[in-house]
Amino acid sequence: MPWPFSSSSSAGSPTHSQKEDGARSKPTSWNDLLPKPDPPLHAAKEWAPVFLTSVASLAAFIFYQSRLRRFPTAGHIQPDLFRKRTLLGRVTSVGDGDNFHMFHTPGGRLAGWDWLRKVPTTKTALKGKTIPVRMAGIDAPEGAHFGRPGQPGAAEALQWLRSYILDKRIWVRIHRRDQYDRVVATVYVRRFLFKKDVGLEMLKLGLATTYEAKSGVEWGGAEEAYKAAEAKAQSKRLGIWNGEASTFESPRAYKTRTNETEGKKSEWFSGWS
């Protein structure tokens, strides 16, 4: 008989001690005591940050190696990058009408160059840190070197090139490394809103000839444009084409002649030794 002042629900519900007895009496197997494996989704959530961090680190390393790594000299450029990469840099010196030195600035202003990172300006600071570049597809008149007299038009070509690219940002599409450890490349500089092919501009003004060789000439895909510009400047008698055709000597012919002359001199002196 239930207590008159108690409710029927409380009378029918098990007591705390009865619950404990029921819990103790529930059979337990060995498998129930083993730790339950995490569901696949839960495991994926735990490992996802580690995986994503590894992938991001690898991607950052690859991006640095391919786009932000600075090449101090031509010797630091891997052979497999030639004909594939365009390097951004600043011209630090112009030594002749068709070659110069550049300081590689990968990433440009986005990587902090010119506002967080400065390009050195002194010869001492630049020593061993620049890439010598030989412009592809053209040959400017030879200046006075090693006791050789300079060609007509050499001073004009050098002066123009200095005014056009010295201390300027340039884009260099690299083709190969030559026997003098220079990078043979097609060179571009921004003029107002457009990028100009520097070699092509020199040909248009009659400041250079197309490179004369039977094989191994690097054109950068612009052979037709270069030869057309040369022919047009020649027809207008611009620059080096302003003199008599009968007395004109191309830079290639000049180098061949002077090399032969020096070779004969060395043979003559060796006969007296």
UniProtKB/Swiss-Prot annotation:
Enzyme Commission (EC) number: 3.1.-.-
Residues annotated as binding Ca(2+): D139
Catalytic residues of the enzyme: R134, E142, R182
InterPro entries: SNase_OB-fold_sf, Staphylococal_nuclease_OB-fold
GO molecular function annotations of the record: endonuclease activity; metal ion binding
UniProt membrane topology term: Single-pass membrane protein
Composition skew (Basic and acidic residues), residue ranges: 257-267
Transmembrane segments: 47-64
Region (Disordered): 1-36, 252-273
Predominant localisation class: mitochondrion
PANTHER family, per database record: EBNA2 BINDING PROTEIN P100, SERINE_THREONINE-PROTEIN KINASE 31
Official protein name in the record: Probable endonuclease LCL3
Gene: LCL3
